[in-house]
């Protein structure tokens, strides 16, 4: 009807054109990226590469990453035609080449489901097959509709996107964040590997606050639950900050730095999309005893990329080996080891006891996600972002890492989700609830 009205206007003609269409829209906009018409600068930077004033070029995400393969080549033909337009002779021609199809490992339903659950939050989610390394989802929220970049957006739309305080253009899964208690299983693995922590040792019930000695002044490490015995398994289940502060002190600054470097800190993740490098300090060392203690429970100056965190967690179900994540689909995928013996195989079972308890023990902080049909393990985390220990105006980052523990599981999966500003809305429990809903759909989907 609209087309008919337009055609009734003298001089108006309609024509069909082919455009790029992003069917996942907002759900994968940071991952897929978008193409745009080339600029004069593009033509200068890519001179001799087959671009013309009518070309489009990948700007970000997969579109930018695989631009050379997706682009293809334009064709043309010079021919002689008669007065009726019939070709009499082809003088010269260049056959066009279509761009290659790029197939990803992404599970589109899981990608959409994670987006729908978290779309109103400032956060991100990563999903992997923990045994093969296939990345099943990469979600950043809030997001934008990348189709708007194809058809062109108004200056008002562009201004609104850029000035939105929730930063929908900001790709959160590429950044580094304070991991909070999701870091504790890593500290447990390092303590066991270095021989500095005995998993059955009772560290003693210190109540809900503790400091090593008076040299710490007024600084106290606090925790939420008192329990006994204070062993590694229970400390993971109850998410005990004091236990892991003590564990970090036992490990020592040099041991911790070296061990974290060995599992990918301060180096690029071997992945198609460039991610920010995880760090254990703003400098090249852990400066103080308090910083070391805080590092033990994922605070201090620890910052971790979500995909890196997910990759480290693969070691807990692969005999201590960290599996390399990848995005481009491969037939008959088998896990490629990125870092071998990140943790000792015999120690992994000790860590698994704790992370299984987080999900399967009614006292565990992630028990909401418990299922009777699939054995799951995981860790919650609530990272405090504030200027000082006494600061009450800071924010909290909520985390949840959860994964299948059996390689024969029908639908193996590992999910890491992070949400900013969970203070006052349930902390990490807010993230646990949403990921539980996602997993329910995932496991029940045929």
What are these regions (language model features)?
Residues 125-130:
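Short hydrophobic alpha-helical segments used for membrane anchoring or interfacial signaling
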Residues 36-44, 194-197, 318-323, 445-446:
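Short helix-capping/linker segments at secondary-structure and domain boundaries
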Residues 59, 309, 427-439:
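Short, charged, low-complexity patches
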Residues 335-337, 432-446:
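Short, gly/Ser/Thr-rich active-site loops of penicillin-recognizing serine hydrolases
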Residues 1-124, 139, 144-171, 176:
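Extracytoplasmic/periplasmic proteins that interact with beta-lactams or build/remodel peptidoglycan
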Residues 82-84, 89-91, 131-182, 186-419, ...:
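Beta-lactam-recognizing serine transpeptidase/beta-lactamase-like catalytic domain environment
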């Amino acid at each position: 009807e609209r087309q008919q009205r337009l055609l009734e206007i003298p001089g108006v003609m309609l024509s069909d054109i082919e455009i790029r269409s992003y069917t996942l829209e907002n759900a994968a906009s940071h991952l897929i990226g978008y193409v745009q018409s080339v600029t004069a600068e593009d033509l200068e930077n890519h001179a001799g590469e087959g671009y013309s004033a009518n070309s489009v070029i990948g700007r970000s995400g997969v579109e930018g990453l695989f631009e050379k393969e997706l682009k293809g080549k334009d064709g043309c033909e010079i021919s002689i035609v008669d007065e009726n337009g019939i070709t009499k002779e082809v003088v010269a021609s260049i056959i066009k080449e279509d761009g290659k199809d790029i197939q990803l490992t992404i599970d589109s339903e899981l990608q959409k489901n994670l987006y729908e659950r978290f779309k109103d939050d400032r956060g991100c989610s990563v999903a992997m097959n923990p045994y093969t390394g296939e990345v099943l989802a990469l979600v950043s929220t809030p997001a934008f509709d990348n189709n708007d970049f194809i058809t062109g957006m108004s200056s008002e739309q562009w201004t609104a996107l850029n000035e939105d305080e929730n930063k929908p253009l900001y790709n959160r899964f590429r950044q580094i964040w304070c991991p909070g208690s999701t870091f504790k299983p890593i500290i447990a693995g390092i303590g066991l590997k270095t021989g500095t922590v005995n998993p059955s040792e009772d560290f003693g019930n210190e109540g809900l606050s503790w400091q090593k000695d008076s040299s710490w002044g007024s600084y106290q490490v606090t925790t939420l639950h008192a329990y006994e015995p204070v062993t590694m398994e229970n400390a993971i289940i109850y998410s005990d900050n004091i236990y892991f502060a003590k564990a970090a002190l036992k490990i020592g600054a040099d041991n911790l730095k070296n061990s974290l470097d060995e599992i990918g800190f301060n180096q690029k993740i071997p992945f198609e999309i460039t991610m920010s490098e995880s760090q254990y300090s703003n400098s090249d060392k852990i400066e103080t005893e308090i910083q070391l203690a805080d590092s033990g429970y994922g605070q201090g100056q620890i910052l971790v990329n979500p995909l890196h965190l997910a990759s480290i967690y693969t070691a807990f179900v692969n005999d201590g080996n960290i599996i390399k994540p990848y995005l481009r689909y491969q037939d008959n995928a088998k896990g490629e080891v990125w870092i071998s013996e990140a943790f000792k195989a015999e120690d992994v079972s000790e860590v698994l006891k704790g992370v299984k308890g987080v999900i399967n023990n009614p006292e565990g902080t992630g028990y909401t996600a418990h299922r009777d049909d699939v054995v799951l393990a995981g860790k919650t985390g609530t990272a405090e972002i504030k200027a000082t220990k006494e600061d009450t105006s800071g924010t909290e980052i909520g985390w949840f890492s959860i994964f299948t523990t059996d390689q024969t599981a029908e639908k193996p999966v590992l999910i890491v989700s992070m949400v900013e500003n969970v203070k006052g809305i349930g902390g990490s429990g807010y993230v646990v609830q949403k990921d539980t809903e996602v997993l329910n759909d995932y496991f029940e989907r045929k």
